[in-house]
C-alpha cells in the first residue's frame, strides 16, 4: 500500500483522524499552498504588516510571540482577524520543554494564553510523554494540534538517532493530539499513519546563515525528503520591499514540488 505521504492533500484530509490536520490539508488544497512563513520580528507593527502581506500565500503563519517587545491583547485579536481574512492557521513556535503540569499552565495561562489563539504549537520530547499529556489536557478540547520536534535544521543539533525514534513512538501513542513533526524528512513508515512534517531551513538562494542554520530547496524538502510544509523566514521578509514577490516565489516552488511528488507516486 502507498504511504499517505505520497497521496494528495485532499485524500489525506478525507481520512485523517486529527481535526487540526484535516483543517490544514483542506486549507492547503483550497489555497494551493504548502508554505509557512516564520515571522521572527520584535515589534507588533512589523509582525502584523508581514502577516498581512504574506497572508494570501501561506497555509500557516509561524510566530515567536515572546520576542515581541510591545505585545498586547490587541496583537492577538488582530492576528486572529488576519487568519480569518487570509485563511491561514497560526502556529506559535513555543517549543515547550518542561514537565506536564508546568507546560499545561504555560500553554493556557500567563501573559500569552497561547492555547486560546494558536491552532498549532510544538514541544520537545526531552521531558518524556508527560509533556504531551499536559498540553493535551488544554489543547484537545479546543481542537488544537501538537507537533513534536523530531529533527532540527541547525548544525550540530542533538535531535537525531534514538531521540528521533522515541519521539515518533510517542507520537504514535498520542495520535489524537499529535498530528506531526518538525523534522527534515518524512516520518510515516506504515500505511495506517499520516504524520504531517513541517520543515524549517528552506531557502532558494543561500545554504547557510553563519549561525549554524542550514538551508535546503523546496524540491529537496518536498520531493526528495517527503516533507509536507516548507517553513521560510528571512528568505521572504529579509528584504521588506520584496515580501509579496518572495512569498509568491516560494509558494509556487513548494506547490510545484508537491505536484511533482504526487505525479511520481500515482498508481
UniProtKB/Swiss-Prot annotation:
Catalyzed reactions per annotation: orotidine 5'-phosphate + H(+) = UMP + CO2
Protein name: Orotidine 5'-phosphate decarboxylase
Annotated keywords: Decarboxylase, Lyase, Pyrimidine biosynthesis
Organism this protein belongs to: Phycomyces blakesleeanus (strain ATCC 8743b / DSM 1359 / FGSC 10004 / NBRC 33097 / NRRL 1555)
One Pfam family recorded for the sequence: OMPdecase
Family stated for the protein in its record: Belongs to the OMP decarboxylase family.
List of catalytic residues: 95 (proton donor)
Amino acids binding substrate: 40, 62-64, 93-102, 215, 234
Gene Ontology biological process terms in this record: 'de novo' pyrimidine nucleobase biosynthetic process; 'de novo' UMP biosynthetic process
Pathway the protein contributes to: Pyrimidine metabolism; UMP biosynthesis via de novo pathway; UMP from orotate: step 2/2
CDD domains named among the record's database cross-references: OMP_decarboxylase_like
EC number: 4.1.1.23
GO terms, molecular function: orotate phosphoribosyltransferase activity; orotidine-5'-phosphate decarboxylase activity
Source superkingdom: Eukaryota
SMART domains the record matches: OMPdecase (SM00934)
Amino acid at each position: 500500500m502507498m504511504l499517505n505521504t505520497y497521496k494528495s492533500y485532499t485524500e489525506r484530509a478525507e481520512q485523517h483522524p486529527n481535526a487540526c490536520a484535516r483543517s490544514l490539508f483542506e486549507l492547503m488544497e483550497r489555497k494551493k499552498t504548502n508554505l509557512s512563513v516564520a515571522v521572527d520580528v520584535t515589534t507588533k507593527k512589523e509582525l502584523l504588516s508581514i502577516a498581512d502581506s504574506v497572508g494570501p500565500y501561506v497555509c500557516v503563519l509561524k510566530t515567536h510571540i515572546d520576542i515581541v517587545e510591545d505585545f498586547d491583547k490587541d496583537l492577538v485579536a488582530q492576528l486572529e482577524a488576519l487568519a480569518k481574512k487570509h485563511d491561514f492557521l497560526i502556529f506559535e513556535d513555543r517549543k515547550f520543554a518542561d514537565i506536564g503540569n508546568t507546560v499545561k499552565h504555560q500553554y493556557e495561562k500567563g501573559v500569552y494564553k497561547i492555547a486560546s489563539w494558536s491552532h498549532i504549537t510544538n514541544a520537545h520530547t526531552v521531558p518524556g510523554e508527560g509533556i504531551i499529556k499536559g498540553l493535551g489536557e488544554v489543547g484537545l478540547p479546543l481542537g488544537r494540534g501538537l507537533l513534536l520536534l523530531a529533527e532540527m535544521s541547525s548544525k550540530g543539533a542533538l535531535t537525531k538517532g534514538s531521540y528521533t525514534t522515541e519521539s515518533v513512538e510517542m507520537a504514535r501513542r498520542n495520535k489524537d493530539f499529535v498530528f506531526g513533526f518538525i523534522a527534515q524528512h518524512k516520518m510515516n513508515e506504515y500505511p495506517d499513519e499520516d504524520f504531517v512534517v513541517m520543515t524549517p531551513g528552506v531557502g532558494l538562494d543561500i545554504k547557510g546563515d553563519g549561525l549554524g542554520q542550514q538551508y535546503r530547496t523546496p524540491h529537496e524538502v518536498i520531493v526528495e525528503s517527503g516533507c509536507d510544509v516548507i517553513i521560510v523566514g528571512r528568505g521572504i521578509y529579509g528584504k521588506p520591499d520584496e515580501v509579496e514577490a518572495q512569498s509568491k516565489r516560494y509558494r509556487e516552488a513548494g506547490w510545484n514540488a508537491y505536484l511533482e511528488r504526487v505525479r511520481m507516486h500515482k498508481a
